[in-house]
Each structure stands twice: as C-alpha cells, then as structure tokens.
Amino acid sequence: MSKYGDVVVISLNHRLNILGYLDLSPFGEEYKNSGNAGNADMVAALQWIHENIANFGGDPENVTLFGQSGGGMKVWTLMQTPAADGLFHKGVVQSGCIDHFVSGNSAEQNGKAIVTSLLAELKLDDVKALETIPYAQLAAAYNKVAPEVAKTGAYVGGNPLANDWYLGDPLEVGFTEHAKTIPV
C-alpha cells in the first residue's frame, strides 16, 4: 500500500479467544472487563498510533482502520468502544459483518462454564490461579474442554462483551454518536 500511495501502514495484534474475550466477570469485580481484553489491546495500539504516527510521516487526525472478515468486525466493534473515540477517523470493512454478539447473562454463563471446566482440567481451585498458567498449558486445557463445553452452547470467540467498555451491538443499541461521524 505505502509503495503506491502516500500512506503509513501499521498492522496491530491483539489477544483472541480465552486470552482476549473470555468473560470472567462472574468471578469478581476485578474481572469486569476481561471479556474485552482483545479490544483493549486494539485501543492501546490506536493510542500508540495517535501519539507516534507523526514520527513516521503520518497524520494522527487522519487514521483509517481496515479489516477483512473478523478484522472488519473489529472495525465495527471499535466504533462502539468509547475509549477509541477520536483515535480513528474512517473505516474500511471488507467482508466483515455486524454480528449479534454474545452479551449479558449468556456471556457470563459461557465464561462460568468454560472457567469451571478449565479449573477442573488444570486441577485448580481458584480463577486467580489461571493467571499463573503458561499459555501453552492453558491453550491445551481449553482445547481439551472446549468440545464438551460447546455442547452446552458455551463459546469464546473474538467478540467483545457489551458493558460500559463496549456499548454493544449497533443493530440492538444503535450506533454511538461518534460512530455516526465515521465514514465506512
């Protein structure tokens, strides 16, 4: 892209699955926004871009997000995330849809079912102990329990949890005032 136009292209990463979107809120206030860790990573990256893009010849007041499929969906979710307001100004959604995200009680029930299974698989007594488990071991445990937990309808994907961090599915709650100003 930058070869063919006067643009600075930055790619960002974020946590996915149980590291990025597992709702641990039923286990305490400290986990209130655990189901939004992946989106929080993207907001942190956008803050860094806003503060540093000029050093690379970019304009912090002219940032366009783009994504394909799940990445396109992330553009929509960031439009509903107040912490991202003003950090990007346009969006390109390539084959990404506004999906009806799991929220509220369903997300809590999913999180509780998955965590209960993980704790049993890892022979742990407390959700706090999950924070000390190496990623490879945690992922292996999740892969082992996920098929059985999925039979109950519980699922962790790449969607944020609707709360005060992410305001929710715009098809249900409407777009935020800021989102209405972003050309897509």
Residue locations for each model-derived region?
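Cap/lid segment of the alpha/beta-hydrolase catalytic domain
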Residues: 1-43, 47, 51-55
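Loop/turn elements at helix/coil->beta-strand transitions in domains of secreted/extracellular proteins
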Residues: 4-10, 59-63, 84-90, 180-184
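Active-site nucleophile loop of the alpha/beta-hydrolase fold
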Residues: 14, 68, 90-102
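Short, solvent-exposed loop/turn and secondary-structure capping segments
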Residues: 20-24, 76-78, 101-106
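Alpha/beta-hydrolase fold nucleophile elbow
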Residues: 49, 56-69
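Short secondary-structure junction motifs
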Residues: 58-61, 73-75, 88, 124-127
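Short glycine-enriched nucleophile-adjacent loop
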Residues: 72-84
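Substrate-access "cap/lid" subdomains that shape
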Residues: 85, 94-184
